[in-house]
Amino acid sequence: MSVRRVVILGSTGSIGMQALEVVAANPDRFQVVGLTAGSSAGQLAEQAERFGVRETALGAGDSERLVRSVDADVVLNGITGSVGLGPTLAALESGRTLALANKESLIVGGELVKRAAAPGQLIPVDSEHSALAQALRSGAAGEVSRLVLTASGGPFRGRSRESLRQVTPAEALAHPTWDMGLVVTTNSSTLVNKGLEVIEAHLLFGVPYDRIEVTVHPQSVVHSMVEFVDGSTIAQASPPDMRLPISLGLGWPDRVPGTGLPLDWTRAHTWTFEPLDGEAFPAVALAKCVGVAGGTYPAVFNAANEQAVAAFHAGAIGYLDIVDTVERVVDAHEPQAELTREGLAEAEGWARSAADRMLGR
C-alpha cells in the first residue's frame, strides 16, 4: 500500500497518542500531516515537532477548519464528546476516509452523519465495532442474524443495584481492562458506554435494535461476534490493545503486520460469557429505547449523561443518580421534527440545563 497521509484529531488523548505509536512504528505506511488537541498546547507542539507536522489546531472549531484545508487520505477522530460532530462531518464532506473513535459524533449526529458518508468511507475504531466489521466480512448482509457486543462488565460486575448506591468516583474509575479518560471510564462502569455502542452498531451496520445484543465477557478477549442465519457465530479475538483497531482504522481494508501481540495458544485460556444484569445496569435497555426513538433523543441521552457524570465526580450526586437522571431527562424531552446541526445543539443545551435543574445545580 502507498503511504497514507493522516490527520489525528485529539492527538494528546489516549486514542490519539496510541495512533501516533502506530504511525511511528509504520513510517512506510503512514505519515502524519495534521494534529489537533482540545487544550494541551504544549504537548501538541511537542508532537508536531516530533512528527514534522506543520498543520495543528486547538479546539473543535479550528479542528474542523484544519480537516477541510489539509490534504489527507485518512482522518482519525479521537476527540471525546459530541464536540467531535463538526470535525466528523467535515472529514466526510471533504471526501476523507474517517477512522471514527469519537462514537458520540455518530450517535448524536445520527442520520446527518449517515447521509454525509459514502459507502466504505466511515471505518469504526471502537474495539467492538472494529471486531464486528471484521466478522461481517464472513457473510453477506442478508445472512446476518444478530450482532453480539461484548462488555467486560466493568468494575462492578456481579453487584446488585442496591450495593452500587455507595460507589465512589475513585471506584468508578478503576476499569479492569482499559485505560481511558474520566467520562469514558465512568460510562464503562455504568454501561452507558455499552448503550452508546449499541446505538453506534445500529447506525454503522443497519441491523435492527432487536437483533443487537450485549453479553458480559470479563476477559475482554473476544471483542464482539456476528451470528449468521445458519447458526454460525464468527468472533474476533485478541489481547486487549487499542492499537489493533486503530491500525485497522488507518489502514482499512488492509491489516498492519505486527501491530499487536497474538494470543498464546500454548497455555490454557478460560473465556466466560454471562447475561447482562439489566436491573443493576439499566443503561443498555434505556439506550436501545433512545435509539429506536431516534431524532434528537440520542443527543439528549448523551448530553444528560455528561452532565450527570460531571456532577457525580464533583460529589454532588450518588452513583445511581447518573443513569436515573439521564432517564428523567429523556422522558421529559420533546423531540424536534427535523434533524439539523443547529437543532442538535439546541437539544443538547436543553438536556444539559434540564439535567442541572433535576440535580439542583
UniProtKB/Swiss-Prot annotation:
Binding-site positions, 1-deoxy-D-xylulose 5-phosphate: 103, 127-128, 152, 175, 188, 193-194, 197
The entry's keywords: Isoprene biosynthesis, Manganese, Metal-binding, NADP, Oxidoreductase
Annotated signal peptide: none
A GO biological process held by the record: isopentenyl diphosphate biosynthetic process, methylerythritol 4-phosphate pathway involved in terpenoid biosynthetic process
GO molecular function terms listed in the Swiss-Prot or TrEMBL record: 1-deoxy-D-xylulose-5-phosphate reductoisomerase activity; manganese ion binding; NADPH binding
Binding site for Mn(2+): 126, 128, 197
Keyword Transmembrane helix: no
Job description of the protein: Catalyzes the NADPH-dependent rearrangement and reduction of 1-deoxy-D-xylulose-5-phosphate (DXP) to 2-C-methyl-D-erythritol 4-phosphate (MEP).
Name this protein carries in UniProt: 1-deoxy-D-xylulose 5-phosphate reductoisomerase
Species annotation: Leifsonia xyli subsp. xyli (strain CTCB07)
